[in-house]
């Protein structure tokens, strides 16, 4: 494509001229390697952006595609690339016969330097030299002659307008110029030489290397002399910045390179040139372009200052000013914010304001700080500001240090590097650089147990008094936080600390035993909530004699609680009616109450938690003459049971049960005095606004596993109730996971175990021996748990037997078909959520218990036959039986079977009202003949007494063995006189067998918790759940 064709392709003269300017000013980069290739890539610098133009070539013609937003086939960038490609193609095909060159005759010729500069082309520095030839007799427009080559006789120049070759005898030039021209010829043959009009462009690194190795004197000289009083030129005021990185001293140009007119020498300041060769830019630029000139100028200026130059001046259209009058001064600070855990830098510039003779402060990242009225008094040097700030950010490598906001500092040298960077930074008057004190100064830690002077305890808190030299609480917390994150240093507000120092290790070892989340301080005192009293006393006793720290009443309280010593005011006959462990439980409850604590009574099912609470309440009301009511929150099925227990053991206390219509309950609440109010979970939820208007003496929640879900409305309602003493009753404080325990404590001792996230991070996620030990140690003073095996030696044995049965062939086939169909459906679902998997498991468990096909129920069920065999044998031996199942239709199926076989039975499930449930239990316990109680596992597992039963059958295996055990213990409890036989009927080669295997595998972890059984299946991953089918 010719120039004329390119002009036509551009369509408009304006577009062609713009493209021509891009091409002529060196803003188009097209590597020579693409010249003879079928496809290639060019880059165009356009308005500070790099535009990429891809092209395919065929027969010298280009088809281009541009990355710009214009999205046209003939944009200005494509036109510029076509011009560049045309030039390179013409030059590659051009060949000249040197013997036919047009000879220019003269007596003497000389090189006239037209311009000198450095240009950055495609990421590398090039030396640019433009020169013309001056002839004393004939001068054919020297500006259009370009150096072509040179030999020992002639210098050849190419006429750019008519593509003709001209020659001049080499001998006509002075010796230095002859050597220079021969040197140019050598460079042109060794390197890829670029041309810009009549200028030569050489790669700077190669150019300097060859020049320094050259032995012949040329017009090039190296000069490291320092020149003072340098004047920098600023051409155009409207640009608000430097647009020429060039200096003058007198009449001498002081650029990166300088041309001495008189001596006809080009002076290269090699020290600066070598410094600048390290810079790499991803695009083609010219250093005289404004947006790149200022950053480049700053690096040049800072180098001069480091090399000892002092006085600099700037020239505008109407004046010459000193550097400080023209350039703004940077104030740059790097600091670490220990509260936000952030490394931050702040920078601002101060400009001389010529309008009001003052200064204007400008924040680069907060432009609004520069007042609009000040704009007439100074000009912002935006790119200069950016260059200066980036320079100092690079010096401190802030990107490297900011990674420590997320990663631990594991070597103190990593923090010492800040001070090293500041020390290595040579000060210049262009900037004032500083670091925050906490990055510069290391401070030794002081720790001594002797600093603890006294401990005082009141109704709400513990006061620890320390000597003035002791470490403050805020710093202790910060040190522990840094330590737990894996840091070996701790950065405080004013200094940093080495955590590997002996004193720091001792401090961490000591204070790491405390829970300081709720601790406060006022100088030399640290305050802890009172519920940490026993833990604090135990820790201090390892190091000091606590009798020298606590007052006598406090020491007695600690010893009494540890030894469970409490003087009850109950009559001797009443208290002696309780078993010894129950008396201990009453004392324990009263001790917690007197010390303003709360607690969890977690005795195993069947040990009489209800009666212990009743006697504690009775003793408290009699001894303290309490005028407030107390509140007991229970499942609906236990309302009447609690009422009857109060009537039996404490008839002198008035009891109100909120099992009346809602319209009447409001009046009941208003008239409460020193009475006991018993409400169900549901009534509490609906009447929470009315109930929370009252303050209670005791607030007791029975079956406290009902508030394990902290987001449920019942849990939220329970935690709103105001009471002097809060107590939770549960046989399974940890039913599913450790968070169950947290929720109970959040009711009885709010904040004691931190918030939910803190507890999860510390205990739930870790699940290590150390975390379990810490949890048990912290909670043990406030949990009382006894098991039947330890306190009831006279209680008969509970014998558990697992009976494995094989499904008959038809049943097994039905099971496997359902299993395979379900797994295939899960496989097809993209979202393999645990819900889909658990649904399949539930179906299979149900199918094991009650085989159904399209025709109805299959009568020949191996599990049913095994259960009936046990039941028939028990009835023959005059024994009552409880059969637990999860499925209502299994209960109905057995009901029909018992009718046919004439077996007496009772049904106890969620379909029965609380009142009728109480009646059913009494009928079953009082029945004279052997009979069967068909009970749903959940309904039968809460608050009932079934000691008449001697045989317990679990027809379908439950996820959570804690729930199974809880149901079993309704028969195996106080009052049981005979051995209880427990049977679990398990179908082999089914999901039931796999569930039992996984439960057994978890026993090691279970043994470390507060209860015998934990429902691990709720925490299994989808992959672990799917492995149950293997």
Swiss-Prot record:
Residues 590-751 form the Helicase ATP-binding domain. ATP binds at residues 603-610. The keyword ATP-binding applies. Keywords: ATP-binding, Helicase, Hydrolase, Metal-binding, Nucleotide-binding, Zinc, Zinc-finger. The keyword ATP-binding applies. A zinc finger (SWIM-type) spans 51-86. Residues 867-1021 form the Helicase C-terminal domain. It comes from the Bacteria. Pfam families: Helicase_C, SNF2-rel_dom, SWIM. Its EC number is 3.6.4.-. Transmembrane segments: none annotated. Belongs to the SNF2/RAD54 helicase family. This is Uncharacterized ATP-dependent helicase MPN_020.
